[in-house]
Regions:
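Phosphate/pyrophosphate-binding loop motifs in nucleotide- or prenyl diphosphate-using proteins
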Residues: 1-170
Length: 170
């Protein structure tokens, strides 16, 4: 048995405990990829953006454990509305196509960012399963934030592509 919230004990395979384990793994993946990007001497801006998402992940875990609402007004410096606009129209903001499919030709940084994006999406699915309650979700705040996080990583990927394109034309 393990503690879910307050004095509520559940089995280790409880969906919320599984979700927390996946969230913990996601945090570790962000730290590992930040370390790799730092060793590759990648732009600090990308590492800082990933740190901002990591801060949200840690706050998300805290809010779930303490059964508190999760609220964060910005991610990577963008409001929820700006995040949506940037992720749905990267051509307007970054001069790159939307969701360029990953390829080894785009390099290790793009592959690492895509790995993080897909890991966030996997966590979103685990979260939906953990908090599904009949026809609704108990923690829609967390589900929505994970969706925003995958958009944020997509935006970081777009920023990276814009950087590559600028280097090629310089």
């Amino acid at each position: 048995m393990t503690q879910l919230v307050r004095n509520v004990l559940v089995n280790k395979d409880d969906k919320r405990i599984v979700f927390r384990g996946k969230l913990d793994s996601l945090e570790a993946l962000f730290v590992l990829n930040q370390t790799i990007l730092l060793e590759m001497q990648e732009d600090q801006e990308f590492i800082d953006d990933l740190e901002d998402i990591l801060v949200s992940l840690r706050e998300m875990m805290r809010c779930d454990v303490l059964d508190e609402p999760f609220t964060r007004e910005t991610i990577i410096g963008l409001t929820h509305e700006e995040l949506r606009a940037h992720s749905h129209n990267p051509m307007k903001y970054y001069k790159v196509k939307q969701m360029v499919l990953p390829s080894y030709k785009l390099g290790k940084t793009y592959a690492l960012l895509n790995q993080l994006r897909t890991a966030v999406r996997e966590n979103e699915v685990a979260d939906a399963a953990a908090f599904h309650n009949g026809k609704s979700y108990d923690r829609a705040d967390i589900i929505e934030e994970l969706n925003r996080m995958s958009s944020a990583v997509h935006i970081i990927m777009c920023k990276y592509l814009a950087k590559i394109q600028n280097q090629e034309t310089s």
